[in-house]
């Protein structure tokens, strides 16, 4: 199904075109088009609608889940001094999950028709159109699917009474991640920390796309040696 020398027509729905690029997909998807208006994905208005998510849907949908999870642990006998470090641990675990997901799933290399198509839907579209404000945060359905492995991890490493709080902390970490991600693309930070985060992330998009996988911090890039060269620690003379 891969067409030799295929050229994508940006005026037509893209999803079922990109698979035809074959091995050329990797180069094509990492040549960003930095316009605010995103492309059309599907001919069908219904399927097109499902690909669009406003940023504020993330806190509106998932913060109540965070509150409910923490309240469950409280109702099962956990005190506030016990819950706070558990929630913080959940946030910390999310940062690792964020890194692994971004590096090994979102940046997997593909060349088959369906591999390219799936990758474009999952993350390739964001690299091709990084300023598309309606396809930047996770759609609620995708987040719900990711909840299952994270919930199983929470249950496996904690007790029945603390698992909801740990999961809630992870979900809070996710909300912070997605809102931060949107902010880095569409806001103009004035504080040094957020200015550096924006520079760090846009460096991943426009300069060194196989480094700098952390969104909310560069911690795991430092740990696993994927810090961009401009951020790497200087060697002593």
From Swiss-Prot:
Its main location: endoplasmic reticulum. Its cofactor is Zn(2+). The keyword Metal-binding applies. Induction: Up-regulated by H(2)O(2) treatment. Zn(2+) 2 binds at residues 126, 181, 185, 201, 205. One of its GO terms (biological process) is very long-chain fatty acid metabolic process. InterPro entries: Fatty_acid_hydroxylase, Scs7. Keywords: Endoplasmic reticulum, Fatty acid biosynthesis, Fatty acid metabolism, Lipid biosynthesis, Lipid metabolism, Membrane, Metal-binding, Oxidoreductase, Transmembrane, Transmembrane helix, Zinc. This is Dihydroceramide fatty acyl 2-hydroxylase FAH1. It comes from Arabidopsis thaliana (Mouse-ear cress). The gene is FAH1.
